[in-house]
Regions:
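Secondary-structure capping and boundary motifs in well-ordered enzyme cores
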Residues: 92, 119-127, 175, 179, ...
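Active-site SXXK
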Residues: 97-98, 120-149, 186, 251-255, ...
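Conserved catalytic neighborhood of penicillin-recognizing serine enzymes
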Residues: 141-208, 261, 273-298, 302-303
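Secondary-structure transition/capping motifs at alpha-helix termini
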Residues: 95, 109-111, 137-145, 218-222, ...
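Mid-domain, small-residue-enriched loop/turn segments at the edges of structured enzyme/sensor domains
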Residues: 161-169, 202-250, 259, 263-266
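Structural recognition of the beta-strand scaffold that forms the well-ordered cores
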Residues: 89-93, 101-103, 146-148, 185, ...
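A penicillin-recognizing enzyme superfamily signal
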Residues: 1-94, 103-104, 109-117, 127, ...
Length: 314
């Protein structure tokens, strides 16, 4: 809090009036009298900042049409205004060669320097198609096989799972219908219960981690805090992994490329001033998913959009 005593060019005059030496004396003070004086100064600073943030001034704010526009509002209102803007990123990748066609990290770099394409976050239910793929390839589960929509748990010591506490996920609606769902419907309605049941059938998270690794999401990559980006925990089946939109999009592009993962390419080639090619990207591919199961999974994803089953399943 005492850091507020440090003035800047934009600090109100009442704050600037406190000399640097006097601020240092107050910070070092230990007596009760000086503490009271510090508190008085602190309260004065709080009031000064409150006044400054509540006073209308001319400033520039982001504008969707013109990029920016001048307005007269309080600094606090400008914060509220920018907080109301939808922040998102967009990336488009050609699934056949990995060429990045579009990269939009946010609204405007001048105002928002946070890149939503490279920033990491939990991916939620977008992880489910990967788990469904593993269930089919590793355990031979068929898309027509049905499972009941009831609560499922994974307990410590169960099968080859490594969770130390019981894992009892719920559906997003917190309701279980007790009805039977095949894989198509389980994915269509994004049933957490069906996903957990499939994971229990697999008996370990390692096959899922292995698939993600083939899809460019390294199972051994560690975050700055030392944790694995793809933990060895059952919760990864429901998207508890920290990856970027770039990684997720490249992984999904595999479904549109007959199960072949292609490393994203940002730069195709570089030429020197004389036109000589000094760098040319080489396509890096991995056969990640069996073509048959990839075709089934692709059909499920298309069904999620159209609501129709091309394989005539009911």
């Amino acid at each position: 809090e005492l850091a507020l005593l440090v003035a800047s060019e934009s600090t109100p005059e009442v704050i600037k009036s406190i000399s640097k030496n006097r601020r240092n004396e107050l910070i070092k003070a230990k007596s009760k009298e000086n503490f009271i004086e510090i508190k008085q100064v602190y309260n004065a600073l709080q009031q000064a900042y409150k006044t400054a943030f509540s006073t209308k001034v001319k400033l520039k704010v982001f504008d969707h049409i013109h990029g920016s526009r001048e307005v007269e509002m309080t600094p606090m209102d400008s914060i509220r205004y920018h907080a109301m803007l939808l922040q998102t990123g967009l990336i488009a990748i050609d699934p056949h060669n990995g060429y990045v066609k579009c990269w939009n990290g946010g609204l405007d770099f001048d105002y928002f320097k946070y890149d939503h394409v490279t920033s990491r976050r939990s991916i939620g239910s977008t992880a489910k198609p990967f788990l469904y793929t593993v269930a089919m390839t590793e355990k031979g589960i068929k898309p027509c096989d049905e499972f009941q929509d009831i609560p499922y748990s994974i307990l410590p010591g169960e099968a080859n799972f490594k969770n130390k506490e019981p894992w009892n996920p719920q559906n997003a609606t917190k309701i279980n219908t007790t009805l039977m769902y095949n894989l198509y419907h389980g994915l269509l309605y994004s049933k957490n219960s069906i996903t957990v049941k499939l994971l229990k059938e697999i008996g370990s998270v390692e096959p899922l981690r292995d698939l993600l690794d083939k899809l460019g999401i390294s199972k051994n990559e560690k975050l700055p805090n030392g944790r694995l980006a793809v933990p060895q925990l059952p919760s990864i089946a429901l998207g508890a992994v920290d990856i970027s939109l770039l990684q997720l999009t490249a992984a999904y592009a595999t479904f549109a490329n007959n199960g072949i993962y292609t490393v994203p390419v940002l730069i195709k080639r570089i030429k020197d001033k004389e036109g000589k090619v000094i760098y040319e990207a080489k396509q890096q591919v991995t056969k990640a998913i069996d073509p048959l199961y990839n075709a089934i999974m692709l059909d499920m994803l298309i069904n999620n959009e159209t609501g129709e089953f091309s394989m005539h399943l009911k």
